[in-house]
Amino acid sequence: WGLAERGIAVVRYEKRTKAYGAACVPAGRELDYDTEAVDDAVAIVEQVRALPELAPDSVYVLGHSLGGTLAPRIAGRSKGLAGIIILAGLARPLEDALEEQFYYTSSLTDSSVNVKAQLDELKQQLANVKKLGTEEFDETISLPLGQPRSYWLFANAYKPVEVAAKLKLPIFVLQGERDYQVTMEDFGLWRSGLLRCKNAYFKSYPKLNHLLQEGSGKATPFEYSHASPVPAYVMDDIASFVRGKQNTL
C-alpha cells in the first residue's frame, strides 16, 4: 500500500511455486528461474503495458530477494520497461549465499554436534553443485534444497550483475545493512559491476534487515515473525526513483 498511497499503481502476485507447488511447471519444461518466476513477470509486464489507463512506457519492475536477482533478466525479456528496482537482490552465486546464511543462523541458535553434521552435509552439497555439468560432479550427493538439476544448472549460469550492466534503462538497487541473507557484499558487487552505468543508483539503510524491517544489532530470523511495515523513507526513495527524481536519492 505504501506505493499506492504515493500515487503509484502496483500489481502484486504470488510466485507460482508458492501458489501451486510442483504443479507449476508447464508440460515439457523443467523447474528453473524462468518457470519459477521470470515467465510470469514478463507476461504481467505485457498485460500492464496494454492497460488503457496507463502509459505503456511508465512500467517498472520491482523485485525483492530472488525477484531482485531476477529483475535484470525480466527486463531483458520484456519490452518497453521504464526501469527496474532491486530490493535485497543476490549478486553472488546462490550456493555461496546459502552456505553463509546457514552458518550465520546456526551460530545464533545451536552449536550441537547434530547441527554441525547438518552443516557439513550442506557444505558438501554446495561444493558439489558448483561442479554440476563437469566430470567432477558426484551423482551420489544430493542436490541442495531438494531442487532439481535443471534449477541448479540455470542458477549457476545466470550472472545477474552482468545482465544488468547490459541494460539501457534506469536501475535502483536498495539494501538493508542488517541483512544476513543478502549482504552488503552483494550490494558492493552490484555497485562495482554497474559502476559505468550512468543511470544506476544505489542506497543502503543501516537499520533494515532482509525484509526491510527496522531493528538494531545482529539480525535474526525471529524478527521476521513480527509484523513491521516497510519504512516510509524507503517508499519515498522508490517513489522518487519512479518519478525520475534520482537527484533526491
Please provide the spans of the model-predicted regions.
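Conserved alpha/beta-hydrolase "acid-adjacent" motif
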Residues: 180-186
